[in-house]
Every structure is written in structure tokens, then in C-alpha cells.
């Protein structure tokens, strides 16, 4: 499918002008999602749940938390026995509306209220609007210490406990790579002469080229696939290593639990899977 032109809001046009008129797709995606005033997540306008823009397992009911809570309880109990005086933390990175945090607290309260009394809840969420929604949803857990912080702040003062990230990795900005004229190219988003958005393609920067080469060698994959046709396009998440390093740095002692859904790389990076994951401009 060939990309088509799309309208561009003034705030985004300002960012593009400041960048010289064009940015890599990853930067465009970051702005669209996380720009503090206008981004989908950054502005706090995202709505998750049956009546919202999309659903996650926790937004549909408490079953997901009920299945997770026995394992989390076992981890926290083990840590509690190892160091009875240590304050423990349950951290959720990217908590959405707060459904999972609320339901986990309720499940743990029912299973071991004495242990829960030693636990604080930490939500990694920068947006003030989302924080207010968390407060409203978590009113029943007002006996539990609750705080918000950034991942960088956690890295400076790592916790003892369990750090959870659920359906977060697929919201990290990605590069879009396209096979054109015999080479793998990086997709950019630019302003056209009419002030709208359109895509263009540029040679891979050396750093991105070396990263792809290294990961493909380690994972036994080939980009592009041998039978890829002209215009074959896929996504590439360069943000993953730095994100995992930052998330791991948030844990002084405990467990980092990351839950997401995807195909194995060998099944994902195939010729028939082109332009499937993102609706592009």
C-alpha cells in the first residue's frame, strides 16, 4: 500500500518546522503519542476500556489481576521473609487508567492483608490528567501509600519489589523500514508544499544500519526477507534496549515482569507481513 498525504495540525507543523521540515517516523510517532499538550497519551486524552478507544485485559475485568496476583504474592512474600524490615513496592510502568493496579491491590488485600501493610504502590505516569484519574479509581486503596514518579527517578532510587509493565512495549515509538530500489531505507515524515504530511525515504543512518545488522545476526533473521517485493515495509523498535535498561535499573532487588503480545521475529519479519501493524499516513 502506498502512503498518502494527510493533514497536519498546527502544533505538529511547528515541531516539524523546528526540525527542518522532516523527522524520522519514530520521532513523528513519539510526538503523536507523547507530546505533553497534544499527544494522545501525553495530553491525558487517551481512554482505555470498553467505552474507550481500545481495550486491554485489565480494562475488561479483574480476571487478569486475579491470575497474576498469586505469583506476585509469592515473590513479595519471599522478599518479605528475606528482609522483614524492608519496605516493598509494587510498581506499574504505564498504568493506563489504573485498572490493573486497583485489582492487584484488591486481590493482595484479600490474600494477605498483613503483607499489604508493608507495600507501597508506585505508578510511573507523567501526565497530570492521568494521575487524577488514578487517584479517583484508587480511592478504595487509600490506606496504601501511593506515589507517582518517572522511570528516571526510580533509577535514582530503585525499589525492592515487583515492577510490572503490561502492554507498554507496543506503544514505544518505532522506525519504519522500507525496501526500495535495492536497499533498506528509513521512512521519514515531512511537510509537503501544501502544509500537509507525507512520507519520504532516506538511507539508513550508520548507527541504525549497524544495529539492524547486529540484531539480525543474533536472532537469525534477514532484513529484508529474501522474497520481499519493492515497497515491503516493516517496523523496527530501536527503543527496546534502552527501555529495558532503564526498567531494570528501577529494581534494586526483586522482579521485573514485562507482559506483551507479539510474534517471534522469524515469523514476523517475512515478505507477506508488510504494512500490517501501523495505519500509516
Task: Map each language-model feature to its residues.
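Rossmann-like AdoMet
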Residues: 1-93, 97-160, 177
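A short SAM/SAH-binding and catalytic strip from SAM-dependent methyltransferases
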Residues: 159-178, 238
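Short phosphate-coordinating micro-motif centered on Lys-Gly-acidic
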Residues: 161, 178-204
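Short, well-ordered beta-to-alpha junction loops that form the rim of enzyme active sites
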Residues: 168, 259-263
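A short glycine-rich, Lys/Arg-flanked "PGG" loop and its adjoining helix->strand segment in the class I
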Residues: 179, 245-252
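Conserved beta-strand signature within the Rossmann-like core of class I S-adenosyl-L-methionine
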Residues: 188, 254-259
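A short, charged helix-loop
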Residues: 192-235
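Conserved small/polar residues in nucleotide/adenosyl-binding loops
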Residues: 279-281
Amino acid at each position: 500500500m502506498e502512503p498518502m498525504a494527510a493533514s497536519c495540525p498546527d502544533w505538529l507543523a511547528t515541531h516539524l518546522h523546528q526540525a527542518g521540515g522532516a523527522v524520522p517516523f519514530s520521532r513523528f510517532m513519539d510526538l503523536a503519542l507523547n507530546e505533553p499538550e497534544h499527544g494522545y497519551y501525553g495530553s491525558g486524552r487517551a481512554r482505555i476500556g470498553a467505552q474507550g478507544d481500545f481495550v486491554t485485559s485489565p480494562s475488561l475485568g479483574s480476571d487478569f489481576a486475579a491470575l497474576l496476583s498469586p505469583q506476585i504474592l509469592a515473590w513479595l512474600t519471599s522478599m518479605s521473609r528475606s528482609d522483614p524490615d524492608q519496605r516493598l513496592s509494587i510498581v506499574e510502568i504505564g498504568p493506563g487508567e489504573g485498572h490493573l493496579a486497583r485489582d492487584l491491590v484488591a486481590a493482595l488485600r484479600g490474600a494477605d492483608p498483613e503483607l499489604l501493610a508493608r507495600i507501597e504502590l508506585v505508578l510511573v505516569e507523567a501526565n497530570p490528567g492521568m494521575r487524577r484519574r488514578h487517584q479517583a479509581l484508587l480511592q478504595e486503596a487509600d490506606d496504601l501509600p501511593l506515589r507517582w514518579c518517572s522511570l528516571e527517578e526510580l533509577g535514582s532510587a530503585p525499589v525492592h519489589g515487583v515492577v510490572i509493565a503490561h502492554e507498554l512495549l507496543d506503544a514505544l515509538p518505532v522506525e519504519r523500514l522500507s525496501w526500495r530500489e535495492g536497499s533498506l531505507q528509513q521512512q521519514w515524515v515531512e511537510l509537503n508544499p501544501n502544509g500537509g504530511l507525507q512520507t519520504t525515504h532516506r538511507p539508513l543512518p550508520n548507527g541504525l544500519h549497524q544495529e539492524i545488522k547486529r540484531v539480525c545476526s543474533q536472532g537469525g533473521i534477514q532484513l529484508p526477507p529474501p522474497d520481499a517485493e519493492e515497497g515491503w515495509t516493516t517496523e523496527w523498535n530501536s527503543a527496546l534496549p534502552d527501555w529495558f535498561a532503564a526498567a531494570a535499573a528501577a529494581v534494586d532487588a526483586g522482579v521485573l515482569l514485562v507482559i506483551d503480545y507479539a510474534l517471534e521475529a522469524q515469523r514476523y519479519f517475512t515478505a507477506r507481513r508488510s504494512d500490517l501493524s501501523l495505519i500509516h499516513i
